[in-house]
């Protein structure tokens, strides 16, 4: 696909991959060398501390666990990414603190509480991106039979921040007793 963009469209493409697992990075770099992708680089590290670029056109995350998704989304906003495609994973942060007595029929059951926390987290993430000038959608990107973690947050930069979206996240956060990392990162 990268070659098609370069050859057919004339785009100057550079792709950077980050992962915390050394063996994954080594394998990806071996593939890069084998197939001659000179503008494709993989680095071992955390996106929160990555300083290799000032701006990007697109950020893609796949199953960045818990708050790693938040750090990636915040970095994408900071870099001014035109497009963000994010497949979140295990949203433990909200699950640890979420509470609301009126929702006890859900909160009293671990699996339901976990799923509710995941939905609330991803909804808040989408709204926070809207508050920073992105048009967002949450889509099912692959059939449930392949993975239960099949939601994709798609965000396209419009440059029109939505203050109401931020208020909605504030209200939900207060009601459910959650304080999401992405909200804090975007406030800095």
Residue ranges and their predicted role:
Residues 10-18:
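Short beta-strand element of Class I
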């Amino acid at each position: 696909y990268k070659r098609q963009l370069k050859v057919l469209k004339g785009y100057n493409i550079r792709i950077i991959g980050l992962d915390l697992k050394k063996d994954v990075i080594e394998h990806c770099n071996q593939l890069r060398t084998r197939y001659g992708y000179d503008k494709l680089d993989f680095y071992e590290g955390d996106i929160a501390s990555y300083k290799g670029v000032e701006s990007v056109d697109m950020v893609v995350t796949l199953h960045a666990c818990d708050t790693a998704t938040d750090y990636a989304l915040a970095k994408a906003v900071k870099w001014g990414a035109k497009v963000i495609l994010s497949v979140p994973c295990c949203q433990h942060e909200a699950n640890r603190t979420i509470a609301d007595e009126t929702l006890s029929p859900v909160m009293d059951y671990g699996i339901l509480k976990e799923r509710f926390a995941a939905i609330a987290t991803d909804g808040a993430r989408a709204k926070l991106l809207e508050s920073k000038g992105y048009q967002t959608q949450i889509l099912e990107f692959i059939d449930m039979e392949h993975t239960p973690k099949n939601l994709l947050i798609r965000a396209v930069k419009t440059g029109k921040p939505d203050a109401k979206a931020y208020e909605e996240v504030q209200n939900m956060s207060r009601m459910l007793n959650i304080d999401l990392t992405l909200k804090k990162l975007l406030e800095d």
